[in-house]
């Protein structure tokens, strides 16, 4: 595609711009557009949100009216949650109206010098590990004395931080954001891994991988070589420098692990960066996240000592393999952010013997391969949420000896207290506990912790790594994790 870096052609004074989405991103877009003297109008299907913004003087329009007048707009700037199939975006595409995401707008404004000298963008994406890796990267940059701002899918939108003094942006981007950012050319970008996720949004695994690969079109492209899909993106990357990382001994042009140390053979000839034992995220996934972050930091010249110091002091974020308590010799860990099978598998493999708390909304993903890979680590499973039966079926097929407790709650349960029954499929026996009472989230997690304690022995780990989204029973993965932690605290007394 032609180089459109810094091209703001549709944003001439007086041009009509439609902004879709009334949330944090949409408001950030309006703020960025205001100095450009364009006529911005906000569209959302949430009538209450539109009314609240209209009361503050924001020009708003209902989706139906926006579709009817779509040809009057010079540009649509969309929030990343809107899929290409969304009616207003489909209408814009059919009418030939350009569609940018908020990241595309931020990239072009920054490249055009609207906020001073353009920053160098270091972009992290992947199905799993994005937030931890981006946080590690930011800490490495700061430890190296660089002015860095953490932004994107973590914290503030990129548009909201461009007025801050910074040399570098540590940016976490989702596949949704990347889909709508075709001109992005970061200083360095990493694809950590690519597994089935959001296929309902992207339409296919190939389309999902293509959107992830957009971070590889800048100067330095980095991929996780232990992930076959991510590794397959490197040969076709447009970047002038291509780097891989792996858990094993690195070849030339790679980062990896040798004798328990992180080793850089891409930007140096075998220099040690850190001791794996100092990484504050358990298991191989923590090492992989550290390698991905280190590759981007090394791409902009951060010294090995700064990388080691940052990793030694790094603390994992909330709901990401977070230890929330110990009861009778059993450690309880909140990894509620493990919202797909790939993330759950990585989480479980960090521990020897696990009582697995799983379920929620699987979004069409299969858990069969996950269960096959971790069956020998499972001491038991406690299943929650709308798609719990899919997990139960996979356990019956691939881990028939693992005891299972299935919790039925919310709309699926008509009881006010707690009922219990036994179900069997062949030789596989499942305890079914019906949980009543309100709020549902508290009742569910209280029952989860009680059931998990029955299944666990001293030395085991009770791991909330659901492999599914949370919105069937919780407001988000954060509330799910908070409810789990509160139930553990109550059990401790």
Curated annotation (Swiss-Prot):
Binding of ATP, residues: 126-132
SUPFAM superfamilies xrefs: MurCD N-terminal domain, MurD-like peptide ligases, catalytic domain, MurD-like peptide ligases, peptide-binding domain
Keyword terms of this UniProt record: ATP-binding, Cell cycle, Cell division, Cell shape, Cell wall biogenesis/degradation, Cytoplasm, Ligase, Nucleotide-binding, Peptidoglycan synthesis
Predominant location: cytoplasm
Pfam families assigned: Mur_ligase_C (PF02875), Mur_ligase_M (PF08245), MurD-like_N (PF21799)
GO cellular-component term (any): cytoplasm
Pathway field: Cell wall biogenesis; peptidoglycan biosynthesis
Protein name per Swiss-Prot or TrEMBL: UDP-N-acetylmuramoylalanine--D-glutamate ligase
Source organism of this protein record: Mycolicibacterium smegmatis (strain ATCC 700084 / mc(2)155)
Gene behind the chain: murD
């Amino acid at each position: 595609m032609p180089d459109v870096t810094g091209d703001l052609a549709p944003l001439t004074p007086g041009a009509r711009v439609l902004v879709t989405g009334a949330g944090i991103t949409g408001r950030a877009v309006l703020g960025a557009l205001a100095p450009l003297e364009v006529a911005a109008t906000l569209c959302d299907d949430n009538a209450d949100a539109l009314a609240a913004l209209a009361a503050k003087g924001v020009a708003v329009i209902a989706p139906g009216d926006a579709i009817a007048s779509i040809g009057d707009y010079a540009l649509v700037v969309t929030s990343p949650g809107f899929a290409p199939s969304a009616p207003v975006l489909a209408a814009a595409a059919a009418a030939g109206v350009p569609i940018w995401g908020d990241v595309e707008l931020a990239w072009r404004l920054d490249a055009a010098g609207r906020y001073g000298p353009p920053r160098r963008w270091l972009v992290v994406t992947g199905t799993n590990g994005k937030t931890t890796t981006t946080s590690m990267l930011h800490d490495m940059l700061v430890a190296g004395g660089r002015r860095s701002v953490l932004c994107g899918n973590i914290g503030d939108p990129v548009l909201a931080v461009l007025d801050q003094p910074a040399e570098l942006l540590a940016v976490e981007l989702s596949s949704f954001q990347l889909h709508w950012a075709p001109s992005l050319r970061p200083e360095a970008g990493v694809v950590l891994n690519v597994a089935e996720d959001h296929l309902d949004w992207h339409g296919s695994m190939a389309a999902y991988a293509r959107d992830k690969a957009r971070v590889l079109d800048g100067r330095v492209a980095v991929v996780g070589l232990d992930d076959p899909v991510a590794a397959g993106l490197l040969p076709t990357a447009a970047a002038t420098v291509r780097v891989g990382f792996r858990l094993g001994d690195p070849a030339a042009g790679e980062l990896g692990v040798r004798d328990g140390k992180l080793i850089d053979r891409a930007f140096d000839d075998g220099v040690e960066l850190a001791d794996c034992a100092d990484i504050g995220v358990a298991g191989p996934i923590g090492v992989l996240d550290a390698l991905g972050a280190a590759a981007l930091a090394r791409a902009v010249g951060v010294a090995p000592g700064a990388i080691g110091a940052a990793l030694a002091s790094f603390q994992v974020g909330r709901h990401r393999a977070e230890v929330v308590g110990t009861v009778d010799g059993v450690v309880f860990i909140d990894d509620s952010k493990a919202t797909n099978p790939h993330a759950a598998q990585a989480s479980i493999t960090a521990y020897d013997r696990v009582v697995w708390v799983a379920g929620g909304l699987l979004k069409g993903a299969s858990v069969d391969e996950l269960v096959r890979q971790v069956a020998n680590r499972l001491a038991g499973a406690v299943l929650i949420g709308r798609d719990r039966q899919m997990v139960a079926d996979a356990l019956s097929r691939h881990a028939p000896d693992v005891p299972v407790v299935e919790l039925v709650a919310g709309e699926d349960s008509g009881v006010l207290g707690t009922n219990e029954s036994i179900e069997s499929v062949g030789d596989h026996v499942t305890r079914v506990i019906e949980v009543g009472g309100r709020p549902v989230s508290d009742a569910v997690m209280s029952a989860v912790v009680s059931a998990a304690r029955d299944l666990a022995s001293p030395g085991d780990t009770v791991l909330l790594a659901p492999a599914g989204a949370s919105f069937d029973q919780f407001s988000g993965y954060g509330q799910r994790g908070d409810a789990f932690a509160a139930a553990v605290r109550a059990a401790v007394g």
